[in-house]
Amino acid sequence: MVVFIGREKELAMLNQAYLKGGNSIVVLYGREQIGKTTLVKKFVQDKTYVYYQARELSEKEQNRYFEKVLFSVKEKAEKERIVFVVDEFDLMQKGYKTFFADFLMKFDEFPKGQVMVLFVSSAIGWVENDMVSDMGELAKYMSLPIKLKEFTFVEMVDRFPESTTKDCILIYGILGGVPGYLEYWNPKESVKQNIVRLIVDKKGVLHTEAQRFLKTSLRELPFYLSLIHI
């Protein structure tokens, strides 16, 4: 079971955007394993919503799947205010270069004041450097992006109330404040046992995490991997 800790500020920002009314677009972004999905689930738990997991598809395939979702959005929005979540939305335009321009036309057709679009992304570099220009006219409907960062040490300590201060310092030093990593840590085991099980063991869930993260986050992967092995 995933424990919801921290994120009060970000949750309040999402709720404020929802209560503000009007058709709007909010962008929530942050690295993988940072807790975006957990926050979104918490946010929509008392709201009517439509969820779409974006994939990198051709324009034809993207349209086929997305049109069905848009129909559901319009149908629900005719009756009540809803949240339309598009997870990893940056993937939409990779094989569909006019996605944002086309979505703008669909956005304008939504019932007035009934739809809050929540775009979610793990592509930090793209969101911070290219998103606004790629979105074009659609960007004018967007509020300030919300970036999820790692837990602070104090927030991390709340996750392990029975652990000693020393152990919490070690946990934070090893895993940082990444919620997805912290979920794997077993406070009933020693620090050494956790390290062996999660990282040292070749079958450990975090054994190859450093390379995987670099591969998805950095453009010049071979260069950065060479630094690791120096």
Feature locations, PLM:
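Walker A/P-loop nucleotide-binding motif
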Residues: 23-40
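Conserved NTP-binding/hydrolysis module of P-loop NTPases
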Residues: 46-52, 56, 60-75
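Amphipathic alpha-helical "lid/sensor" segments that cap RecA-like P-loop NTPase cores
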Residues: 161-213
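Sensor-1/coupling segment of RecA-like P-loop NTPase cores
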Residues: 29, 91-99, 103-135
